[in-house]
Amino acid sequence: MPLTNAPRLLSERLILRGPEARDMEPVIAFLQDETRAKGFGHIPERGAAWRWFALNVGHWHIHGYGYFTIETKTGEIAGISGIWNPETWPEPELGWVVFDGFEGRGIAYEAACRVRRWAYEELGFATLTSNIVPGNDRSIALAERMGATYERSYHNTNMGENMLFRHPAQEATL
């Protein structure tokens, strides 16, 4: 059952949909994985990971956007990607993560490109950023592959030091 009014976005191999209760355990498992969740700045205990999932549901209701669940066309939950802009964020961010076993298949790239197109075409954003923890080389490479360029570093009150990458305007992504 959908927990938000998120649209259903399709790409060549993926379905991006709003969060559902069945997504909670895979998201919590990701957030608590000491290796995989470094890009989120810290490893939360289970209760805080549960609250992050609930926060994303609320984020959709407050802003009309948030993280989509990335689902393969065969029904596997592969990760999350979306637009994130909670209190204290410098501006709307395009974010992505893929879960264990889904790396190296272009899933994050395909999902993030589809979300960015939706944000530009349907939400009217002129630009987006991606905030990346230093040392997250895979996310840096993905941001650069999408045409984003490093703009500055800043201290994110939730995640510590972040590198802000600026995505090109819609016209440059066509």
Task: Put a short name on every predicted segment.
Residues 45-64:
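Active-site rim helix/loop that mediates acceptor-substrate recognition in acyltransferases
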Residues 1-39, 54, 67-174:
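Acyl-donor (CoA/ACP) binding surface of acyl/acetyltransferases
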